[in-house]
């Protein structure tokens, strides 16, 4: 079992709002962009499933409990009502790995992957404005989709990596 803490630090000055979506007001009286974290890859209990209206406002903290009952690659992303895509685009998305001591295949036989070095990558496309800041055109006819012109790997545009001549396990 893991407890993962999310602290919302997206205020109205740093958070981008499109259309008529309004900021949420936290119990501390501060306003900001709401977040709700949803995790794919685990049978989470309802309070930790990140449903769209269970939001954390600016300055607030929420602890999520995940059972980690099996090995695998999971991922999390924002799930706040009407702004999921924007929050994920600006960074509230990532990978979550659960590893066992031995990687066992479907028939109970070892996969023999335990000594292979792993590399983890998140792939996405983004658009940058003239100041090299992430950008979404709120008036674009594809406002609910994004067709980025720059490929990012784990947050880095067009990266490169030096590798040794050996086996690697890539998790994407």
Residue ranges and their predicted role:
Residues 1-171:
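Histidine-centered copper-binding motifs that mark active-site loops
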């Amino acid at each position: 079992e893991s407890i993962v803490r999310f602290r919302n630090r997206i205020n109205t000055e740093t958070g981008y709002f499109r259309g008529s979506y309004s900021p949420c007001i936290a119990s501390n009286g501060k306003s900001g962009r709401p977040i709700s974290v949803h995790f794919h890859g685990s049978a989470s209990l309802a309070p930790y499933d990140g449903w769209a209206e269970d939001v954390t406002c600016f300055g607030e903290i929420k602890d999520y409990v995940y059972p980690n009952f099996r090995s695998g690659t999971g991922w999390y992303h924002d799930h706040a009502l009407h702004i999921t895509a924007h929050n994920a685009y600006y960074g509230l998305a990532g990978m979550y790995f659960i590893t066992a001591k031995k990687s066992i295949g479907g028939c109970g036989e070892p996969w023999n992957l335990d000594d292979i070095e792993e590399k983890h990558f998140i792939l996405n496309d983004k658009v940058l404005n003239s100041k090299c800041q992430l950008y979404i055109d709120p008036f674009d006819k594809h406002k609910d989709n994004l067709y980025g012109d720059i490929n990012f790997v784990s947050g880095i545009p067009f990266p490169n990596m030096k590798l040794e001549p050996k086996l690697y396990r890539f998790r994407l």
